A protein has these predicted regions:
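A short glycine-centered flexible hinge/capping loop motif at secondary-structure junctions
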Residues: 115-118
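Active-site entrance/lid segments in N-terminal catalytic domains of soluble metabolic enzymes
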Residues: 1-113
Length: 118
């Protein structure tokens, strides 16, 4: 029988960090209170969001659609990247997944996930 007090596996939350997200501050308070282990952020690289999550060991992966956004996210403190390449749903990029990964790996050796055209 499952024990509800024992975590089954790491989980993550998606946080849209664009300034138009009026729930972000409250959602982050709840996530930090419960020490969410992994965040996937999108639509803006915000240092204060990364700092809040990392204050207890949380990991932040940021959705990016090109190399410029990747560099911005890492410079603001993201731990890793989700490369949303051509063929992905939602706010997809226009670059081939193989080209995008290669561009990013030229300067970044941290966690890198790929989304789209797989």
């Amino acid at each position: 029988m499952a024990n509800p007090d024992t975590p089954a596996a790491p989980y993550s939350v998606n946080q849209i960090v664009h300034r138009s997200n009026i729930r972000l501050e409250r959602d982050m308070e709840i996530c930090v209170k419960h020490e969410v282990p992994i965040y996937v952020t999108s639509l803006g690289a915000r240092e204060e969001i990364y700092n809040a999550a990392q204050s207890y060991g949380g990991i932040c992966l940021h959705d990016i659609i090109n190399n410029d956004f990747a560099k911005k996210a890492i410079s603001k403190g993201a731990d890793g990247l989700v490369a949303v390449a051509a063929g992905a749903g939602g706010h997809a990029g226009s670059t081939s997944p193989f080209a995008l990964i290669q561009e990013i790996r030229e300067w970044f050796d941290g966690p890198l996930l790929l989304s789209g055209s797989i």
